Amino acid sequence: MSQNELKIPKKLIEVNLPLDDINDACVREKAIRHGHPSTLHLYWARRPLAAARAILFASLVNDPGYEVGGGFRRGINKKEAQKKREELFDIIRDLVKWENLNNQSVLARARDAIKASWRETCALNANHPERVRKILWVTLR
């Protein structure tokens, strides 16, 4: 790996998602008739908030079991990775519930997981000359 290549771990969305839980939350959200913005106006291309929250979170969080090489630190073993992945899935399961829309403890857990992934990615690229600009570009595109 050359000096100028960014070291970006795989994101959770690239590996696995709890799709059944996300789908169930989307179906349930679609059936809500009180207090939901969709009750004001029937928009023809409405997307469930549950799916959007799950996808955004999973695209910002590193997968715990990524295999790395060429200057990266080695990923953790499969059992530990699956345990940490389940913890991230639990956050997703909580994020997609309509009742947790403004639940600050759930949002804090999600923010902490995103911050930990960001710190990990920054630590992997600590010696890269253009690390901040390139990491932001790769993350936000």
Language model features: what each stretch is:
Residues M1-R141:
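S-adenosyl-L-methionine-dependent nucleic acid methyltransferase catalytic domains
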